[in-house]
């Protein structure tokens, strides 16, 4: 069903219903205008907006410049009936295009449902419409009626391309941000759109981005509709809350104030400019405003000015605000419902998300100050369709977004070149002491009268330099921790899957009816929306500098197109002072070739050689092994843009190696993270439960603190670093285009010197030349993008994250002391729990929380680069064993030869997992290239691998050290060996002096983190310092090795159990790496994090969790109990029963029994999963095994209370009961493998995580939404954390 009621024509006669002359609220009397009601609550007025504000009634250009990148004025636009008809059809077509997507249908339904609150009465027990949320509709007989509405689309005012969402009403700013909302007016035109450079973002396809692209006008209208949604629901951010820029330097934009509302509406990583502390402030503010509205509805006893009933209007606002209603009719705000509505309005509805649904190209940031504007006509289907936009299917316009490419689809786009009233703000950058004879003209920004060379730089081409005032820093505030301290739920990233979940649960029914309203005054007088005062900055401000800038270098590459000959030069001075010279950063050989005149007979060969050389110059890259996280360097960026202000441009590669990515930044960001605020722990005398809960809450709040700091750093990085990198990206594209233009001009000049007869013998096409040069530029931009992205991520990871981690580690140390003292002070209350709680505190606070960029941004380009950053650590590996293409191979650049014995076993699920037995034929030999055989006294090196060591079962293993990895020759080298409860690293020099570093673990422990479980081992060796062993990213032991002499290792590495007395012994090993450097702690943690494969769920041992495999269950909150079934059927329940009991062999091991209780089997919900591996967010069923028969885990979601008791049901009896579980992998990177199971109802709504709740001292399994509110990353304390235990030979327990 279409969104627009019917097809309208502007000349259709008025009927007083959906075609009528109307009066809208304004600041004075107005003449009625013809309007069209395209849907309930939504009208379109195909007129220029000269009536909402009399001060804006003049359509001519203003006398002074506006502080915007570009303005366009044409007083004749939209003055004829044909133009108005085309406008009407264009707007309705865009509404249908938006409505055709799932996201658009949700947004438009929200807008129709978003009736402004009836708060127009001065009596608090009375509901009354606010008159400025109404229009007067003129009837055919001349009378009028008043009608409430939500949205009006109006033509633009004087500036045709200034699209905006505005409103009128009493104290209008409060209405749009106090929860009430007010009627919205959008100034918009479907006949104009904006350009952007997509090649700045393209990473892989040189065919994409061959020119300028045009924005789909549906995206532009959707952006304004999102604003309307915020304002109708009264959650718009105060326009005074803006993102400011500094203005004190020549390279910074002046006067730019981007409102938080715009950043939030755009979405993507721009929304991350608003730091989390401020976003939490907004959310809490509007939550309280919604509670005020619920309170007002509860007080209301009557309604006036309408024939609608009070109860009907209450129900309208109940639907709008998703209020809860109890049996007495009292309304309240449910926090979960509010959070869902607020998330939908502010994070689901964004421009960035609409781009994904429209499947179009779009600007990548709101801070896109491209000045290209195009005239378009979207009404004909041959130009634009509802489903495809410009990229028409079954045509050449469908591929590579060619329909939006303004050069390929040039018939659809008319670029506005001669702007009426094109105002630009600029700065004048002058370098002192330059002799200016024969300089370029003053019109180009050069001062001929002074001994200063001045260039004019547009304000919007300068660096975006955010002010420190933008970043809230309340991290130093202390906090009181109690037993009921609120733990914030971890935020869920916005994904297409999440949006689809919102769509599936969205209620599209119950669209509000038209309500009869008593006639208001014939002229509804509104109050103008006051806009914030933007500080104005002087235009043309002059800055006197003593050196050239990036902008001088770019200007030196420009020239005036004409009939005169130009020539390239490698001298910036010469190019700036001589109008016929153009600066190039290409080689002197290229300069000689391009400047050399050629005869006609040689012309085509000359051109072909120049194109080849141009491609060769732009393709230049350098590589270095000195920087692990930057794999390629574009050496000409320095001389192209004067990076480093001339100091480093002649050796840009050397400067980057010496200084790092910081040399790219014009201004170095400062991150002011104070000493983090401490926690004040509240004591509870003689109350064990509340005391333990307080400790748990402190640890969870600690995790929140890490999250806050990481978010704060990412916000600073995006705003302060990434924006600078993006400007360099843009300027490099301009620089390459300048070189192409100069090359073309020289070639074209030479061609025009020939006689007509000579030209006739030359088959030369300037357009073909342009295409070839543009293709070279776009290929070059792929490398430039990769390099700049790597630099940006490198700066984040090496200069910003470590600073935050140091602050957090200091905080952890302080909290650890406070918690241990708290436990000691309350030891009398915590009888039987003291040691367990001390261990929990020590373990939790001695482990850093790894940084994961994907938690904080969803920009795929940056996330891809972050992943590459992690992989680049592997690139320093000189041996990297992986199983690929049915072979075990060395992925390092050395490709070492590998020999595999006949008794080596590769796990069938993950073939990187290699099993070695205590057999002569169970071995792997790696033959190293001579270049990497270790033979040194000083060179550092490291190794890392994962290992799973089965339990030692008998006394034959005591005091039996045996080698598993050996690189010794002539009693010199290194090896890894095992002993009962030990992993041992040995270094030995040629004089047989040795050093050992050991990790020890115990087998006399209830539940071990190490026995038969995958362990990540890293050993680093600094030859002038220590050898260190890390387990799961944590430093365990270190010993000095500076006393060792030359170590000459073997040229092969043998993986084999050598010297083991137990003939049944075996080990598992995977991901072996050898590095020719000492890995630092951050690199070890990054490597650990990457190799943990957090997107795949793991079982108790660390293997991949699988479908259709039986598992015993371990609850991490109460690990001494197991799951049992009271009875099957809907009246039965499952519960935790204990204790587990023990398995033991005297003096060898003493452990809890793991194979106890009811087994769970994970079953596929859909057939899309092909490899039988359970992944994060998989939707599954859980079967439970009772007396060798499988039953389905399910619940009745209509049970009273938050906790829904789970039952084991016959599978055919499940029916409509809730049984779908979403599997969650906790990305804690710890030595345990926590899983969480989120049960959902049949509509996809969360019922809650599966845990347990005490009912009459019985710990029954439940699905509880309490967990969803309380859960926090890395928590080991909540009852919804589980581990799946399969039977495994390495544990040695007989299953019951």
Swiss-Prot record:
Listed cofactors = Zn(2+)
In UniProt terms, what is the effect of altering residue 953 to R?
A: Whole toxin is non-toxic, almost no binding of RBD to neurons
UniProt entry keywords in alphabetical sequence? Cell wall, Disulfide bond, Host cell membrane, Host cytoplasm, Host cytoplasmic vesicle, Host membrane, Host synapse, Hydrolase, Lipid-binding, Membrane, Metal-binding, Metalloprotease, Neurotoxin, Pharmaceutical, Protease, Secreted, Toxin, Transmembrane, Transmembrane helix, Ubl conjugation, Virulence, Zinc
**Record's superkingdom?**
Bacteria
Annotated a ganglioside GT1b (d18:1(4E)) binding sites:
1117, 1203
Q: What is the effect of changing residue 266 to A?
A: Light chain has 50% cleavage activity on SNAP25, no effect on Zn(2+) binding
Question: How is this chain modified after translation?
Answer: In a bacterial culture the precursor chain is initally cleaved on the amino side of Gly-445 and is processed more slowly between Lys-448 and Ala-449 to give the final mature heavy chain sequence.
Question: Hey, where's the site called Transition state stabilizer on this chain?
Answer: 363, 366
* Cellular component annotations (GO), alphabetically ordered: extracellular region; host cell cytoplasmic vesicle; host cell cytosol; host cell plasma membrane; host cell presynaptic membrane; membrane
Phenotypic consequence of residue 1253 to A? Strongly reduced toxicity, heavy chain has very strongly reduced binding to synaptosomes, decrease in ganglioside GT1b binding
Q: Where is this region: Belt?
A: 492-545
The transmembrane segments are: 627-647, 656-676
Which Cys pairs are S-S linked? 430-454, 1235-1280
Per its record, what triggers expression of this gene product? In cultured bacteria, first detected in late exponential growth (17 hours), reaches maximal levels at 24-25 hours and remains nearly constant for 5 days (at protein level).
Instruction: List, alphabetically, the Pfam families matched.
Output: Peptidase_M27, Toxin_R_bind_C, Toxin_R_bind_N, Toxin_trans
Enzyme active site: 224 (proton acceptor)
Reaction(s) catalysed (UniProt annotation): Limited hydrolysis of proteins of the neuroexocytosis apparatus, synaptobrevins, SNAP25 or syntaxin. No detected action on small molecule substrates
Motif Host ganglioside-binding motif location, chain numbering: 1264-1267
Matches recorded under PROSITE patterns: ZINC_PROTEASE
Translocation domain (TD): where is this region?
449-870
Q: By its UniProt entry, which Gene3D superfamilies does this protein fall under?
A: 1.20.58.540, 2.60.120.200, 2.80.10.50, Clostridium botulinum neurotoxin b, 'coiled-coil' domain, Clostridium neurotoxins, Metalloproteases ('zincins'), catalytic domain like
For biotechnology, the entry says the protein is used as follows: Dynamin inhibitors slow toxin uptake by nerve cells, and might be used to prolong the treatment window for antitoxins.
State the name under which the record lists this protein.
Answer: Botulinum neurotoxin type A
- Name of the gene encoding the protein in the UniProt record: botA
